[in-house]
């Protein structure tokens, strides 16, 4: 994950430069200055994770490449929207989500601060979450069939629901999670899961 490595490397360079500058100077209380320089370096590195400078001049050729720049998981699924893509990554046994914004000539970094969960509901054997990309206002829905087996899912927008399957040998069952792009969401949005109508943003 280059995102983290670059910040560690730049932080080390900045601190080393500050350390040498302080050691060669004639100021008093050098130890205090060195500790202060270390704290400031850590703060700058942390701030750069929320406001990455490279996002202004680095463009990626695919959403997956943008994902791998600041995520270490393997991409399992990509759900494409008009201005963004929703990527499902897996790191170990855990899944992680990222929304990658699209620009004219490629893709930019997907940052956690740009994602908002705008809906969540557990109903009739399913767990539903709705995520919005703040800048584009595009939304994606995640539907987990918690009781196992495939689900019959449709919505009022005729969205295409893609899915990932997770097999549980201990329970001798397969569990499915469904993903779809649903555009700019409003409170009237509804989907039907196994014949049950659900409005995730009114719950």
Short names for language-model regions:
Residues 115-142:
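Extracellular ectodomain segments of secreted/surface proteins
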């Amino acid at each position: 994950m280059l995102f983290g490595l670059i910040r560690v490397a730049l932080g080390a360079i900045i601190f080393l430069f500050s350390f040498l500058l302080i050691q060669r100077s004639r100021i008093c209380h050098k130890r205090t200055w060195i500790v202060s320089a270390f704290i400031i370096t850590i703060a700058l590195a942390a701030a750069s994770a929320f406001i990455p400078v490279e996002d202004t001049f680095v463009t990626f050729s695919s959403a997956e490449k943008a994902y791998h720049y600041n995520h270490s998981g393997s991409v399992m699924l990509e759900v494409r929207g008009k201005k963004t893509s929703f990527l499902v990554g897996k790191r170990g046994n855990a899944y992680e989500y990222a929304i990658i914004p699209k620009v004219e000539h490629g893709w930019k970094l997907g940052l956690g601060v740009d994602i908002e969960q705008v809906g969540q509901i557990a109903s009739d054997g399913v767990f539903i979450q709705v995520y919005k990309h703040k800048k584009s206002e595009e939304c994606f829905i995640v539907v987990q069939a918690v009781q196992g087996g495939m689900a019959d899912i449709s919505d009022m927008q005729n969205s295409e629901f893609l899915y990932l399957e997770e097999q549980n040998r201990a329970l001798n069952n397969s569990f499915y999670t469904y993903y779809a792009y649903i555009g700019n969401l409003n409170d009237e949005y509804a989907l039907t899961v196994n014949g049950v109508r659900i409005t995730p943003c009114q719950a």
